[in-house]
């Protein structure tokens, strides 16, 4: 599937959130939007623009293109409960996201690469589809030939235990993780308002 090839740092500054560790460091120095008038006073933002920005935040943060993102929304609508909560819970189950949450990669782009290159197993079977939906109880581990890669070991060593969410159990020594449960919305600490996304799509 095609991926965004532009400057993630510029997108991060425009949206006001750090999408990668590199963007986070850059935004500490230049926290305003890119462009000549980035530091100037901004005009009033329309309701549509606010809704669109929140959608862009979610798409770029999780690395999802429009068609697939809209499909997640449709599935969220069809489920019981609050549509926005359902949307977040669905996306959090993505394989590349779970690999990132477990600390196996410093970014979702890095975790997506690990998955796409076939380095990982789910319950003993190779899965190389980033959008694969992980289920509670699934065991995620590296293939024997892919174990102890320096990039993974480095990422794990730099991931504090406090950053690993409660719904994922990680064995750093053996580079394994178990997806314990689908998180509740309140457990997912990300800087977006999914309700505005729901309002945008429901028009």
Curated annotation (Swiss-Prot):
Keywords: Ribonucleoprotein, Ribosomal protein, RNA-binding, rRNA-binding
Residue stretches making up the S4 RNA-binding domain: 93-153
Matches recorded under CDD domains: S4
SMART domains: Ribosomal_S4 (SM01390), S4 (SM00363)
Primary role: One of the primary rRNA binding proteins, it binds directly to 16S rRNA where it nucleates assembly of the body of the 30S subunit.
Stored NCBIfam families: PRK05327.1 (NF003717), rpsD_bact (TIGR01017)
Protein name from the UniProt record: Small ribosomal subunit protein uS4
Species this protein is from: Chlorobium phaeovibrioides (strain DSM 265 / 1930)
């Amino acid at each position: 599937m095609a991926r965004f090839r532009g400057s993630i740092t510029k997108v991060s500054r425009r949206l006001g959130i750090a999408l990668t560790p590199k963007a986070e460091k850059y935004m500490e120095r230049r926290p305003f939007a890119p462009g000549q008038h980035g530091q100037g006073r901004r005009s009033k933002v329309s309701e549509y623009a606010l809704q669109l920005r929140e959608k862009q935040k979610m798409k770029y943060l999780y690395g999802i293109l429009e068609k697939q993102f809209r499909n997640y929304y449709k599935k969220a609508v069809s489920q019981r409960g609050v549509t926005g909560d359902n949307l977040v819970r669905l996306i959090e189950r993505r394989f590349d996201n779970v690999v990132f949450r477990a600390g196996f990669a410093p970014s979702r782009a890095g975790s997506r690469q690990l998955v796409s290159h076939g380095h990982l197993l789910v319950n003993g079977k190779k899965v190389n589809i980033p959008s694969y939906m992980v289920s509670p109880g699934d065991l995620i581990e590296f293939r024997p030939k892919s174990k102890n890669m320096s990039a993974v070991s480095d990422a794990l060593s730099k991931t504090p235990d406090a950053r690993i969410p409660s719904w994922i159990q990680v064995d750093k020594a053996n580079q394994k993780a178990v997806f314990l449960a689908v998180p509740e919305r309140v457990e997912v600490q990300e800087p977006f308002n999914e309700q505005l996304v729901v309002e945008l799509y429901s028009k």
